[in-house]
Structure formats: structure tokens, C-alpha cells
Amino acid sequence: MGKPVVAIVGRPNVGKSTIFNRIAGERISIVEDTPGVTRDRIYSSAEWLNYDFNLIDTGGIDIGDEPFLAQIRQQAEIAMDEADVIIFMVNGREGVTAADEEVAKILYRTKKPVVLAVNKLDNTEMRANIYDFYSLGFGEPYPISGTHGLGLGDLLDAVAEHFKNIPETKYNEEVIQFCLIGRPNVGKSSLVNAMLGEERVIVSNVAGTTRDAVDTSFTYNQQEFVIVDTAGMRKKGKVYETTEKYSVLRALKAIDRSEVVAVVLDGEEGIIEQDKRIAGYAHEAGKAVVIVVNKWDAVDKDESTMKEFEENIRDHFQFLDYAPILFMSALTKKRIHTLMPAIIKASENHSLRVQTNVLNDVIMDAVAMNPTPTHNGSRLKIYYATQVSVKPPSFVVFVNDPELMHFSYERFLENRIRDAFGFEGTPIKIFARARK
């Protein structure tokens, strides 16, 4: 199943971003920045009581020049659409306001669990008026202080209680789950329709749903597939659903539930920052990735156009140097037939295990070719390596001192492993560990 999604909702200036940073900040600070990946602080991974979950700060959703109450309304509705649990945050020093009651009215309509957090209660004396917040109708209010981190444990305990009740859609291990992501109007739905119209594709049914995310199940060459959240690709109409961050949010949920991610670019419009942002999430989540350039039929081209476009992609997506690039047209169906084989290959490589003895031969040959680096008179010594997991393939290299493993040498080892075993379409991870 995908990770549960928790949204923090409330009127401006109640401390949503402070709480977001409190819950997610420690996690964010230990994640190494990936070159070329643009981070968006609206959305972050977090962990509590052995639950991994995704956290949304709806205050980071820019609705534009909408009137004040309309902004609050739209942010709350985004949370109701996308979250599994909602943290409704109010300012304990100001008491219940008309704007709080406005948010409460919107949240009454949701069937999602709502946990009420009363922020800015920095000491015991300030908590005397907490009972006023029962009037909002969401049960026990949890007193917290974002500034000092007080009360967050109790709040997160209450949130985590609801995780066990979240419905999930389970598929067999053999089923390949993938999604098509990209900004609005790049042609994701058209690509799906073109794919499902191929001769060898048998669409069997619409699979079970997780909330409103309808998945499409089909068989291709006797292999079962699920396209995650085909409903999300087609969902249009409301004002906020056309905002960049809403579409990013929807894409992140689909990425989370997929093994392979097809990043769809617009051949006519080229690459924009949002493309990099969404692709960066797929990479950081360790998913297999295929890059699809759609609308290639509409591009004026000569014999060098495709090569130049590919070089431009490699330049913008340096962190996806392992991902194959496919050029196609959903409209004319030209080269549509290349997509499914690329997804299958990426999935196979995402799950690929290599023999330990062969891996160590590759590592030792690499060291012989390019001796290990030294630092302050100490030389890195590599003893042996082993693959510890798949999805994505992950390797531990046992060394004398992990601090001596410079990222450039780690990158060199990754390239040698790729040369030996392929791994096209999937990231691989390498960790240096001290031999005990």
C-alpha cells in the first residue's frame, strides 16, 4: 500500500508550517540533497510509531489571488480529497474564531478522521481555555506548542491510531504497478488510451480503489499490470485542481504506490521546473523510471532534433541518467509500442539480484583500474561488497573507514556496477559500512 497521507489544515497564522517543520524537519535534514532535484516543502516524509507517512502543509498551496475565505476553503477541500487523516490546527491564544468555524464547517462534510490540534499553548496556564475548542465538534482538542515541540507525541499518537483503519488495495507480487506522471495537459490520459488500445493489451477490469484513486488493470503479453490512479490523470474542473502544487501532490501519491514511474514530457513545450520537481520525487523514492516525450508528431524536426532534445533532457535530469528516453505520439500512436517493453525492462532491473562473487569481481576490477582515494594520509580499503535488497537494488560495501568513501568514488563504483549488470531504468544505492 502507499504511505498514509496526513494534511495540516487551518486558517493562516495558526502555526501550520512550524508544526510541519517540527514533524518533518528532522527527517528532511538527514536526506542528502540530490543534484538537480528541486525540493518542495509542501510535502514531506515523516515517521511515527513505526509508521511511515506523508505530510502535507496545505498552507504551502498557493491558490493565487483568491479572497481570504475562498483560499481557506480550497485548501481544506484539497486536504479532504487527498488526505487519509486531517490535523485541524487552531490558535489556542486567540480562542475560537469565525475563520476556525468556517474551516470546521467544511471539514464536517468529510468522512476522513479529523484530529484537532490547539497550537501556541506554551505552558500549563495557557491550557485553561482549551475546553472552548470542544465547540468545534471534533472531540478532544490536543494542546501543542510548535515553538517548543510540546504535546506533539500525544497528537501524533492520535493521528497514528487512524492509520490501521485506512483501506488499501493489494495486488499480487507478480503484478507490475506503474504510473504516468507529468504536469497537466502533457497527454497522460491519451497515452493510457493509446496503450490500452494496442493489440496485445487486454483490459480486464477497473481494479479496487484506494479512496478515489481508480486503478486500471490490464494484461500485456500474459503479464499483469496496474496503472495507478488513472482517475487522477483525468480529474479536472475545480479551480484548485489546475494549480501546479495540486497536480504535484496527486502525482506524489501515485509515485508512492508504483514500482515504475513514466515521467511524461511535452515535446512541443519542452522541459519546465515542475517536470524536474516531479521526476525528482520519483528518483528520491527509489522508483524505476522511464522518460516519455509525448506529442513528438507536433515537433518540427530534422535529423538532429531528437538527439538535441535527448541531450537537453540529460542536462536537466542529470539525476536520471539511468532512465531510458522514449519519443512517441499518443495522437498518431507512433512508437507507442516501445513503452510497455521499456516498463517491463525497468521493472525487471528494479528487482534484479546479482551474485555476490560476481559483484566482488567487478568491485575488485574497478579498484585495480582506479585505486581507492586517500584522505589525510589514510587510504580507503575495500574488503568486499554484497547486495542487501532490491526495489531499488542496494549494495553495502564493507570498508576500513566509511568517511574515506568520497561521493565521486562511490559514483565510480556505481558506474562500474552498471557497466557489468545493466540496471537500465532503475536507481541503485551504495552504502559504505565499516567492517566489524
From Swiss-Prot:
Gene Ontology molecular function: any one: ribosome binding
Keywords, sorted A to Z: GTP-binding, Nucleotide-binding, Repeat, Ribosome biogenesis
Gene3D superfamilies with a match to the protein in the record: 3.30.300.20, P-loop containing nucleotide triphosphate hydrolases
Residues annotated to bind GTP 1: 10-17, 57-61, 119-122
Ranges for domain EngA-type G: 4-167, 176-351
SUPFAM superfamilies (UniProt xref): P-loop containing nucleoside triphosphate hydrolases (SSF52540)
Residues annotated as binding GTP 2: 182-189, 229-233, 294-297
InterPro entries: G_ENGA, GTP-bd, GTPase_Der, KH_dom-like, KH_dom-like_a/b, P-loop_NTPase, Small_GTP-bd
Domain KH-like: 352-436
PROSITE patterns in UniProt: G_ENGA
GO BP term (any one): ribosome biogenesis
General function of this protein: GTPase that plays an essential role in the late steps of ribosome biogenesis.
More details: Estimated to be present at 7000 copies per cell.
Subunit structure: Cofractionates with the 70S ribosome; association is stabilized by the non-hydrolyzable GTP analog GMPPNP, and inhibited by GTP or GDP.
Protein name: GTPase Der
Native species: Bacillus subtilis (strain 168)
Lineage: Bacteria, Bacillati, Bacillota, Bacilli, Bacillales
